[in-house]
């Protein structure tokens, strides 16, 4: 068998009118690769000395798409047929003495084994041309090949030029030829355009050559050309069938092959089971006995052995052995999940490292995080990783647990053996040491008669404790102590209010003593020592004690004109068992406190953080 140099010419100048697209036909995708890329990767396995791509329509797009491949581009400015395309090679291959393999750019399913067989047959027999043909059930749309018993070509007829009798021939021309270039170069200038399309046919060159033979492809499916979207879809199905048949022979189960798709870059171990409606894209490696689907999307990810990915999306991530994912989980890019983990329904993981035997069984978001081993994530746990400007990182130690509906505000580091109580919000940068319980809750608030925009909206709200409602307040510099307390008592309204504690400072104080008609003013900075009395919507009756810089104390009825210097931190309480009002008292002549017993209240009775009794639960500062 004579060894000669090999050049390859790929015809890629046509528009592909029937594709109804602005994209050149050869750049349409078949799976992850364009038609011409698939073909080019196949022909390059033959190791040709030169690989020539003939371009025309939207040639800049084709040049850009193939810029990483070792090819030469030859322009066909006018698209006047396949023969005209090959004529453009005459100056390019002027001194070439080897063989030329000519392939249409829209035949992406050709296998390297078939082209190698064509090349070997051509070099063994040494005709001027060897044509790749095939026997098909439906030859419509293809040119026909007529041969004698020795496979010498007698006639080639294009579909549009066939007589009714010739159309009955089921042997078709694939458009793949192996020419001896010196012989082809002699006849190319003699091509004519005497046909229905007024084009230069390459088949005309075959007729002009002295010796021409045909070789049938073993699998007619691989010479399918792509002229429209229907044929593109059919070619995709052929590609999928080819891939799945190979994997089934290697020990992989496809429960419903027709509903599954995958790419050539996928690697499947023996005893993998692919359930219906599952799709694999990119570079994927799936370990033994793993079950994918039903209804899963796996992209560019590595999944270990004995896993189950159920109705879920896994993208650009790594999953260990014996991991359960789903249903309806989303493992986003740059995530690593350790052995024995469970990522359950409606759990989203992004850029996270999950230690072994960690569970997030349902309804959680774990983003930009590192979780240790044997961590348990309660339902509704959210890592709040974005502050509106940048993402922050969260770390959770081994064996820690989060209760239901917890929010972890990043950046945050939680130690090992930590329990986060249900409903807790852990603020950013809050130190959480090893081996502790953390409770950080907001307690229920009831606003009777509240509606959006009503007077009740926006008021400070109480923390329930026994039969009391507790209101912590802070007054700001310049505010009037009495006026602010009167306003607060009216707006709540306080039912039977009184002062629990008060600390702070005043820039001045106005007080009045009993039986006095005039106030006295202290115009200096003063510390609040005590504030006591009652509050209700009708008014307040409060006494104030203050001290000056020399330690002298002053006291009396609180009057308007007590102005806050730096702050006043006041805790008020409101009894749910009584109702206060201020009514005229004939004996004193003043508005005095009137006390009324109301129906016994039964508010919630929260326990202390240690669970030993009733009181205000302890929370982190």
From Swiss-Prot:
UniProt region (Pyrophosphorylase), positions on chain: 1-229
Subcellular location: Cytoplasm
Binding annotation for UDP-N-acetyl-alpha-D-glucosamine: 11-14, 25, 76, 81-82, 143, 158, 173, 227, 332, 350, 365, 376
Catalytic activity: alpha-D-glucosamine 1-phosphate + acetyl-CoA = N-acetyl-alpha-D-glucosamine 1-phosphate + CoA + H(+); N-acetyl-alpha-D-glucosamine 1-phosphate + UTP + H(+) = UDP-N-acetyl-alpha-D-glucosamine + diphosphate
GO MF, one example: UDP-N-acetylglucosamine diphosphorylase activity
Entry keyword annotation includes Metal-binding: yes
InterPro entries: Bifunctional_GlmU (IPR005882), GlmU-like (IPR050065), GlmU_C_LbH (IPR038009), Hexapep (IPR001451), MobA-like_NTP_Trfase (IPR025877), Nucleotide-diphossugar_trans (IPR029044), PPC_dom (IPR005175), Trimer_LpxA-like_sf (IPR011004)
Keywords of the record: Acyltransferase, Cell shape, Cell wall biogenesis/degradation, Cytoplasm, Magnesium, Metal-binding, Multifunctional enzyme, Nucleotidyltransferase, Peptidoglycan synthesis, Repeat, Transferase
Region feature N-acetyltransferase, mapped onto this chain: 251-621
Region annotated Linker, chain positions: 230-250
Broad class of where this protein is predominantly found: cytoplasm
GO terms classed as biological process: cell morphogenesis; cell wall organization; lipid A biosynthetic process; peptidoglycan biosynthetic process; regulation of cell shape; UDP-N-acetylglucosamine biosynthetic process
Annotated residues for binding of acetyl-CoA: 379, 385-386, 422, 441
Biological or metabolic pathway of the protein: Nucleotide-sugar biosynthesis; UDP-N-acetyl-alpha-D-glucosamine biosynthesis; N-acetyl-alpha-D-glucosamine 1-phosphate from alpha-D-glucosamine 6-phosphate (route II): step 2/2; Nucleotide-sugar biosynthesis; UDP-N-acetyl-alpha-D-glucosamine biosynthesis; UDP-N-acetyl-alpha-D-glucosamine from N-acetyl-alpha-D-glucosamine 1-phosphate: step 1/1; Bacterial outer membrane biogenesis; LPS lipid A biosynthesis
Entry annotated with the keyword Cytoplasm: yes
Protein task: Catalyzes the last two sequential reactions in the de novo biosynthetic pathway for UDP-N-acetylglucosamine (UDP-GlcNAc). The C-terminal domain catalyzes the transfer of acetyl group from acetyl coenzyme A to glucosamine-1-phosphate (GlcN-1-P) to produce N-acetylglucosamine-1-phosphate (GlcNAc-1-P), which is converted into UDP-GlcNAc by the transfer of uridine 5-monophosphate (from uridine 5-triphosphate), a reaction catalyzed by the N-terminal domain.
Record-linked NCBIfam families: glmU, PRK14360.1
Family, per entry: In the N-terminal section; belongs to the N-acetylglucosamine-1-phosphate uridyltransferase family. In the C-terminal section; belongs to the transferase hexapeptide repeat family.
Protein name as catalogued: Bifunctional protein GlmU
Origin species: Synechococcus sp. (strain JA-3-3Ab) (Cyanobacteria bacterium Yellowstone A-Prime)
């Amino acid at each position: 068998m004579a060894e000669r140099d090999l050049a390859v010419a790929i015809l890629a100048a046509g528009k592909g009118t029937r594709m109804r697209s602005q994209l050149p036909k050869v750049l349409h995708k078949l799976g992850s690769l364009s038609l011409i890329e698939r073909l080019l990767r196949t022909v390059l396995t033959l190791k040709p000395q030169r690989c020539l791509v003939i371009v025309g329509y939207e040639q800049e797009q084709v040049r850009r798409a193939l810029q990483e491949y070792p090819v030469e581009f030859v322009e066909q400015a006018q698209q006047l047929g396949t023969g005209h395309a090959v004529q453009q090679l005459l100056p390019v291959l002027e001194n070439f003495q080897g063989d030329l393999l000519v392939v249409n750019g829209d035949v992406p399913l050709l296998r390297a084994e078939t082209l190698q067989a064509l090349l070997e047959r051509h070099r063994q027999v040494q005709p001027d041309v060897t044509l790749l043909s095939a026997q098909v059930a439906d030859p419509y749309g293809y040119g026909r090949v007529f041969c004698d018993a020795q496979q010498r070509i007698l006639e080639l007829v294009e579909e549009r030029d066939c007589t009714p009798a010739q159309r009955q021939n089921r042997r078709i021309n694939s458009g793949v030829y192996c020419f001896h270039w010196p012989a082809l170069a002699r006849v190319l200038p003699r091509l004519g355009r005497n046909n229905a399309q007024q084009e230069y046919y390459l088949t005309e060159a075959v007729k002009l050559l002295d010796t021409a033979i045909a070789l049938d492809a073993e699998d007619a499916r691989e010479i399918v050309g792509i002229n429209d979207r229907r044929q593109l879809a059919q070619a995709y199905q052929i590609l999928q069938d080819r891939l799945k048949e190979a994997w089934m022979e290697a020990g992989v189960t496809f429960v419903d092959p027709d509903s599954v798709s995958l790419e050539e870059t996928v690697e499947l171990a023996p005893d993998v089971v692919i359930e219906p409606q599952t799709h694999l894209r990119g570079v994927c490696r799936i370990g033994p006995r793993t079950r994918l689907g039903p209804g899963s999307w796996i992209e560019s990810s590595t999944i270990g052995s004995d896993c189950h990915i159920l109705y879920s999306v896994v993208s650009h991530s790594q999953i260990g052995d014996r991991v359960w994912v789903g249903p309806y989980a989303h493992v986003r890019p740059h995530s690593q999940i350790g052995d024995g983990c469970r990522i359950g329904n409606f759990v989203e993981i992004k850029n996270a490292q999950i230690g072994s035997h960690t569970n997030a069984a349902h309804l959680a978001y774990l983003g930009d995080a590192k979780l240790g081993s044997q961590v348990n994530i309660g339902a509704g746990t959210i890592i709040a990783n974005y502050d509106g400007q940048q993402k922050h990182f969260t770390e959770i130690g081994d064996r820690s647990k989060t209760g239901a509906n917890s929010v972890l505000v990043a950046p945050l580091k939680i130690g090992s053996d930590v329990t986060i109580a249900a409903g807790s919000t852990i603020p950013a940068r809050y130190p959480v040491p090893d081996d502790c319980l953390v409770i950080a809750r907001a307690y229920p608030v009831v606003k009777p008669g509240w509606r959006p925009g009503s007077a009740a909206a926006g008021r400070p709200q109480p923390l329930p404790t026994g039969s009391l409602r507790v209101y912590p307040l802070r007054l700001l510099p310049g505010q009037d102590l009495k006026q602010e307390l009167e306003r607060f008592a009216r707006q709540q309204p306080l039912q039977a209010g009184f002062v629990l504690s008060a600390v702070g400072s005043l820039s001045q104080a106005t007080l009045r003593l009993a039986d006095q008609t005039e106030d006295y003013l202290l115009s200096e900075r003063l510390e609040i020592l005590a504030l006591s009395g009652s509050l209700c919507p009708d008014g307040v009756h409060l006494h104030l004690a203050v001290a000056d810089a020399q330690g002298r104390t002053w006291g009396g009825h609180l009057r308007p004109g007590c102005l806050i210097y730096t702050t006043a931190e006041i805790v008020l309480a409101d009894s749910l068992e009584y109702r206060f009002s201020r009514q005229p008292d004939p004996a004193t002549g003043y508005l005095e406190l009137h006390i009324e017993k109301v129906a016994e209240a039964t508010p919630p009775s929260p326990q202390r953080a240690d669970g030993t009794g009733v009181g205000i639960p302890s929370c982190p500062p």
